[in-house]
Amino acid sequence: MIKWPWKAQEITQNEDWPWNDALAIPLLVNLTAQEQARLIALAERFLQQKRLVALQGFELDSLKSARIALIFCLPILELGIEWLDGFHEVLIYPAPFVVDDEWEDDIGLVHSQRVVQSGQSWQQGPIILNWLDIQDSFDASGFNLIIHEVAHKLDMRNGDRASGIPFIPLRDVAGWEHDLHAAMNNIQDEIDLVGESAASIDAYAATDPAECFAVLSEYFFSAPELFAPRFPALWQRFCQFYRQDPSQRLRVNAAEGDYGEESEH
C-alpha cells in the first residue's frame, strides 16, 4: 500500500481560475467555443467536488489545478459530471512513485515487489497521478495519464473491476468485446513485427482489455488520427460511448485553418 506523506498541500477553493490560460494547450485547441464553455463549467464543478492534494513537496497553483480539472472533464464532456462520482481526492506526486505490488500467479502463489507507477485508480478510492506525466498530457501525442485513469474509473462503473467494457447497452457488449480484442491482436501483431518501442500505438494496450480501453481512450482524445483509420469499427463505438468525435473536430479545425490561409492571399 502507498505510504502517505505527513505533509501534503491541498488546493483551496478559488473563484478566479485562469481558464483562458488553462485552455491554451494542444489537447484542447480543437474544441469549439461552446465546448470550451461547457468544459469550463464542468471543471468548476469538478474543483468544487474533488480535493487536489499535492504530495512530497509538489506545489499546486491555480493554473495547474485548472488544467488538471479540464483534462479530467474532457472525457465526460457529453456524459455529465456524475460519471466522475465514486472518488473525492486526486493525489499528485511530483514524479512517478513507488508502490508495493502484490499478485497471484497461475498456481496460487502470491508475489510481492516494489514497482514504479505513473498513476493508479480504484473503484472506491482516489486517483493518484504524477506531475511529470501530467505535463506530458497537455500535447496531442497519444499519451495522456489523466484520461487513462479517468477511463479506468468509467470502466469500473460497469462492475467491481475494470474489464475494458464500460457502461454501455447490453446489446452492444458482444460487438464491443469483439472489436476491442481485434484491436489488441492487431497491436500485438505490430509489436511482434517491429518491437514495442517502434509500435505506433502504446504496447500497453495489448496487455489487457481494461488497459486497451484506457490506452485507446488516450488516443481517442489526443491522437484521433492514429486511432480512427486503423480501428474504424471500434472508433465508432468509442464515439457512441463518449458522445464525441475528436476526429471530426480535427477535420473542422484543419479546414478552417486552410480557409484562413486562402483568405489571406
Swiss-Prot record:
GO terms for cellular component: cytosol. Zn(2+) binds at residues 111, 148, 152, 211. Signal peptide: none annotated. The keyword Zinc applies. CDD domains: Peptidase_M90_mtfA. Its cofactor is Zn(2+). Pfam families: Peptidase_M90. SUPFAM superfamilies: Metalloproteases ('zincins'), catalytic domain. Gene3D superfamilies: Collagenase (Catalytic Domain), Glucose-regulated metallo-peptidase M90, N-terminal domain. NCBIfam families: PRK15410.1 (NF011939). Interacts with Mlc. This is Mlc titration factor A. It comes from Salmonella schwarzengrund (strain CVM19633).
